[in-house]
């Protein structure tokens, strides 16, 4: 007992122990010879129970040391799968096989030449007087925007100063900084400070061994996230200021949103930002998605270098599932090569009801590959808003034989029976298209009559009835910003579902398949005009009454505005030369209408 107490006191005094040495000492200790099948958790409980009488600090030390012992015991029984034949190199293939020459770039040669020509002209603008210092490169993710810029600058010997986005602040760090008295600075604020310092002081050019300063290019690859209209206006003003005042060649990379998200406010605001930068003098070069054949060539080259056991059909399916994103395709290939036996098992198992013709039908094999690869490593299936609208408006259905076999035992009247649709459930299509309820209904209102046969008056009446019901469900969001108009709310989801299913159900005699142009809803123009008119009335009310709310907008529009216009005309008739004549013409028109009504 005395020895045990002395040993515990020694452990108490030794506060500066090394956890790594404790771990290695724990490994070197021999196992107990009491039995060959000793339970490690039982021994852990025994050791902990033996140390329960010690002081609190010694107990914590023992727990940490014993946790390392258990971790070592778990690692001793871990074995690497024999099916994993890859090397121990953990480098990402995206970085390992990045292009090092212009020939290795998968970007279209015309786009590369445009970027290279801009660099050559902007670097010697002092000779030819060019002042186009900003290049705007757009395109979806993984089309080689940054790779092209870095490769061309390295070939031309240009030093790239890149804007490095700050590390995001987690909530615990924010709480700690707030308690310490540090003020939180958003990423947008830091970007504005960076642009301001770049405008004022520029960037330092590095000198070569010969003492000649290398040309400098500023690269902005990761714009801060702007959430909301006010934040977007700040970001847009900051970029416009940079375009108008920068003295060094500047490249701004903007990643376009997917077409499936085209109905989002963020996508439209980014398009407005790009247009404003072009008007300010920036040169825009839009990168297209990488072609399927180019992606397949890159994947085949990587397979030869890495000795991957991937078939040509699998490479073709990966290239198709990438959607023009070469970075996504290379990452999918690397993930696919980690456990090839599991991936092949998933791919070779056809869907139910397809066993008979799976091996004989190549299209079925591709669908099996799609279900295997896309579910594991591919993107979630998405649709553009116009693709979804095309499915709803064209209303393609199966043949007559299907309805007889499936609905022969049902009690549905022939008048209400419909053929099965050649698509998924309408709600699933809406979710894949990220369609906002109000926008979907507006598009259907504007374009549905073009897809109804000329003599199908009852179909047009039925479709209009369902669309009216959808308008009733969506009445609360009319006139609001579309950022609050989403399909997550129950009334909006119900309204979108009623509108879509009403169009599909009511149009029994759709027009034959031909080219149709989807028109933009005219209602949007009316709403924008209404919003602008209300804004002008608010400004006029604030100016006239010094900000005091003396009248509602409707009262301003119906009473005060006509009176103010009439008073302005009485005060200075020359300012409104045609007002009196227009009034006389209006009176004559009204009198003629009255005569027609009396007759």
From Swiss-Prot:
ATP binds at residues 139-146. It is found in: Nucleus. Disruption phenotype: Suppressor of sni1 mutation symptoms including the accumulation of DNA damage leading to a constitutively activated DNA damage responses (DDR) and increased basal expression of pathogenesis-related (PR) genes. InterPro entries: Checkpoint_prot_Rad17_Rad24 (IPR004582), P-loop_NTPase (IPR027417), RFC_lid (IPR047854). Interacts with SNI1. Seems to be involved in regulation of DNA repair correlated to non-homologous double strand breaks (DSBs) repair. In vitro, involved in rapid but not in slow DSB repair mechanism. Required for effective immune responses that involve activation of DNA damage responses. Residues 18-41 have a biased composition (Polar residues). The lineage of its organism: Eukaryota, Viridiplantae, Streptophyta, Embryophyta, Tracheophyta. Residues 581-599 have a biased composition (Acidic residues). Belongs to the rad17/RAD24 family. Keywords: ATP-binding, Cell cycle, DNA damage, Nucleotide-binding, Nucleus, Plant defense. It comes from Arabidopsis thaliana. GO terms for molecular function: ATP binding. One of its GO terms (cellular component) is nucleus. Pfam families: Rad17 (PF03215). Induction: By genotoxic stress and by DNA damage. Negatively regulated by the key immune regulator SNI1. One of its GO terms (biological process) is defense response. This is Cell cycle checkpoint protein RAD17. Transmembrane segments: none annotated. Disulfide bonds: none annotated. Residues 1-54, 575-599 are annotated as: Disordered.
